[in-house]
């Protein structure tokens, strides 16, 4: 009884011309997601996913590495033009935006800050004492 060799078809990645880069920069990490114009996620990366641990995840260098990683994945989908949505006050925020603009073959069309701000909603948590 010889086993049959199972061959899988290679998954074809859809070609998307434009995309949106979501940069979520928290105090502890920087997460980047690339979507198509409809909002369907194509690829993502974060400082933690690249092996940075602890306080090193929130550094600008870790954010830069995460952007370079995710944009290399995004180029496989044929993305040439992107918009950027930035959220959060983290340390890797500015570096991540600059890195997206510096990547060859990617044109930044627009940039938007979508950080949620309360209009005096919920009471904030008590101040941290170190």
From Swiss-Prot:
Any one annotated GO CC term: ribonucleoprotein complex
Paired cysteines (S-S): none
Statement: the UniProt record of this protein carries the keyword Mitochondrion: no
GO molecular function, one term: rRNA binding
Swiss-Prot/TrEMBL keywords: Ribonucleoprotein, Ribosomal protein, RNA-binding, rRNA-binding
Matching InterPro entries: Ribosomal_uS11 (IPR001971), Ribosomal_uS11_bac-type (IPR019981), Ribosomal_uS11_sf (IPR036967)
One GO biological process term: translation
Annotated signal sequence range: none
HAMAP family: Ribosomal_uS11
Subunit text: Part of the 30S ribosomal subunit. Interacts with proteins S7 and S18. Binds to IF-3.
Family listed: Belongs to the universal ribosomal protein uS11 family.
Free-text function comment from the UniProt entry: Located on the platform of the 30S subunit, it bridges several disparate RNA helices of the 16S rRNA. Forms part of the Shine-Dalgarno cleft in the 70S ribosome.
Name of the protein in question: Small ribosomal subunit protein uS11
Source species of the chain: Nautilia profundicola (strain ATCC BAA-1463 / DSM 18972 / AmH)
Lineage: Bacteria, Pseudomonadati, Campylobacterota, Epsilonproteobacteria, Nautiliales
